[in-house]
């Protein structure tokens, strides 16, 4: 059985707290100088505190969402994303949490989550063919705040994701001026990307792809679509390579090729809700292009 986001969070929290809670209970017993089970010694005593620590950890992990609005919102948002994709309800959930963080003055304190929700929401608007709403959403974060308030471990990926959404908006609008402006800001970060870091490569390559699509250089865009096929061991990269190729051939009016790559993408999908939405978006785009011939 596959665990959802909330269940994985509870399990992870339980595992991480387990040793600490076991030690805490053993120390508390010694501090109180009250041995509740004096007849249990040796390994049995160790097992007792281990079990008690596990039970306490599980209870605490289960109760955290009850008392933490941020954790509760994160569970709802990520569960919706994993189970149904970037739906209208997903947009509403992210909007609620974004507004809560702003009104409570905690947006900068939890900027990693705030900026993630904004980027995901903007991307969801693009799936709905609503670039203007995506612009309004992504404009709630900026590069300087990402550099200042995002933790160092995730800062690079968050910044790349920010540029990725901006460039995707430029592509949707076919706005070369916007694409050039985004590229000027993004270039220093893109140049630092090491292709061995697959996560960063996937995002950076998509930024380049969207840039060339927005500026009408479809040959260069196709080169970047093909780069994903250098990582065919990763099924998601194959999916991206085919998906990006579909976009290129729609723009160039080569609908037979677009159909071929779309079918390849359908074969490469892992059937996540998000990938199904991307495929539906591409199918709709191809049908529109054919109807407009």
Region locations from a protein language model:
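Long, non-transmembrane cytosolic or organellar matrix-exposed soluble domains/tails
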Residues: 205, 213-293
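Flexible helix-coil transition and linker loops at the boundaries of alpha-helical arrays
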Residues: 98-111, 143-157, 173-175, 189-198, ...
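N-terminal alpha-helical membrane-insertion module
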Residues: 1-91
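Alpha-helical adaptor scaffolds
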Residues: 164-234
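"A position-specific structural signal for the A-helix of alpha-solenoid helical repeats
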Residues: 71-79, 113-123, 158-168, 200-211, ...
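Membrane-protein extramembrane domains
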Residues: 87-95, 99, 121, 250, ...
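Helix-turn-helix repeat elements of alpha-solenoid scaffolds
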Residues: 47-53, 80-103, 126-146, 173-187, ...
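Acidic, polar-rich low-complexity tracts and alpha-helical solenoid repeat scaffolds
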Residues: 37-38, 42, 50-51, 71, ...
